[in-house]
From Swiss-Prot:
The chain crosses the membrane at residues 398-418, 424-444, 486-506, 507-527. It is a multi-pass membrane protein. Belongs to the 3-beta-HSD family. 3beta-hydroxysteroid-dehydrogenase/decarboxylase involved in sterol synthesis. Catalyzes the formation of 3-oxosteroids from 3beta-hydroxysteroids-4alpha-carboxylate. Involved in the regulation of inflorescence internodes and leaves growth, probably by affecting auxin transporter activity possibly by altering sterol composition in the membranes. Its EC number is 1.1.1.418. It comes from the Eukaryota. It catalyses: a 3beta-hydroxysteroid-4alpha-carboxylate + NAD(+) = a 3-oxosteroid + CO2 + NADH; 4alpha-carboxy-4beta,14alpha-dimethyl-9beta,19-cyclo-5alpha-ergost-24(24(1))-en-3beta-ol + NAD(+) = cycloeucalenone + CO2 + NADH. GO terms for molecular function: 3-beta-hydroxysteroid dehydrogenase (NAD+)/C4-decarboxylase activity. This is 3beta-hydroxysteroid-dehydrogenase/decarboxylase isoform 2. Glycans are attached at N146, N158, N474. Residues 384-564 form the Reticulon domain.
Amino acid sequence: MSPAATETERWCVVTGGRGFAARHLVEMLVRYEMFCVRIADLAPAIMLDPQEGNGVLDEGLRSGRVQYISADLRDKSQVVKAFQGAEVVFHMAAPDSSINNHQLQYSVNVQGTQNVIDACVDVGVKRLIYTSSPSVVFDGVHGILNGTESMAYPIKHNDSYSATKAEGEELIMKANGRNGLLTCCIRPSSIFGPGDRLLVPSLVAAARAGKSKFIIGDGNNLYDFTYVENVAHAHVCAERALASGGDVSTKAAGQAYFITNMEPIKFWEFMSQLLDGLGYERPSIKIPAFIMMPIAHLVELTYKVLGPYGMTVPQLTPSRVRLLSCSRTFDSTKAKDRLGYAPVVPLQEGIRRTIDSFSHLTAGSQSKREGPSKASRILGGGKVADTLLWKDLKQTLIAIFILISIYYNFVATGSTVVTALSKALLVASVFLFLHGILPEKIFGYTVEKIPASQFHLSKDSSHDLSLSVISSWNTTVKALRSLCQGNDWSFFFKVVFVLLALSLAGAISLHSIFVIGLPIAFLAFLVYEKKEQEIDSIVVSFKSFACKHKSDVYEKLFGSKKHD
């Protein structure tokens, strides 16, 4: 139960107060003693992070100047209870923007926002500041350069988050003036800074997985990134403007405002500075967005299927690809003129502070894998593993070039297997002959000759090959004997499954193997190596599910026979 506010205390409420930007706002409000702060969030109790111990928030909680109340915005009675005695509400709560679940986003961003408005009116809150997003004017297709608040909402938004934030924003602006309530909307662009749990951690995870070397798009798209302390400052400016009275509050109320650092920068240059500062490789390889989009759709579809079995929310989604390849810059002149907003931390200083705050994620701090990965062990750990896992980039690119050459010269022409093989042997013979007649030096460069020993099969290799053939023959004979006895149903089904798989594989053309199989081989093992834990957990869940039903099926099929 929240203690009642005394006459001398001025209380404000921050919904979603344990979120990234909200934490910085709470700390600013408490540090400068602007308000007593009531944090409203979903968790049943507040749990301070280690770095918050003995800090401003910890001291505020102990002194009573900061309160925590558990509240679900979808329950109006809980919202009303949280707002009792408050003069100002900073409505910052929202689901993760990467979760493209319309029902969840709508229930919080629209229905929850309506509950916030109604509760403010019911308990007499004077000012309501809503944290919106620049994505409310983004259609996911067309870039935005120096966008202003005069831009209309698009017919179709990039995702459910953007669409529902736009609906919530409309509700907030229409509520201005109800029972004396003054409202406005803040649209902070691409927030970054200490305490971020999405941008920098995702960037570092990509770097450690070897994916940060890629640039999606042409790399020239501009962005407005906003340091988190400037976002908190913008909320304070909005509250002060609404509280000023007269023309200032009249002009400020019922409006939306873009908030930026007022220093546009190329998106990939910003990412490069963060990566470079943390000791990782800068992105340099450009991949067109139209190539990444089908992959992103496939990842999103996979998540819809495997999400219930523990798959984490993917960062590569169609909406993210659009965001990474488009320009998005905004004009903050209106916020400057009507709210008195100006950034208090410059962009480069914000980047420096952010890098310093994530020192535990630097390249030298990551734990090393002991021994080869499971994917490498599956592939034998030799040259094949190094090639398919891109360990030796030169070797991998040479292998890809050779396979592409084989495809276009022998497979794509529609040749039969015998014709393709004869052509390949012809090319090999011509190459070896010409290579043999070349002089040892050409224009001062030494020509490395292929020694005859390369084509010689040693006695040990011959012995090993013979043992492999004999072992395979004995294994086959043993399997046939087991089948002849007719007792092992499990083994019978395994044999049937393998033979059916081979028959299906035999129906696949050489063309399909090259076009579909080889690209998958060069990607599947690499993906498995990078996401080994996640994939293994999904496999374990599937096996557990299969085992639960295996005994029932077996009993139904063969139980009656045993009873007979």
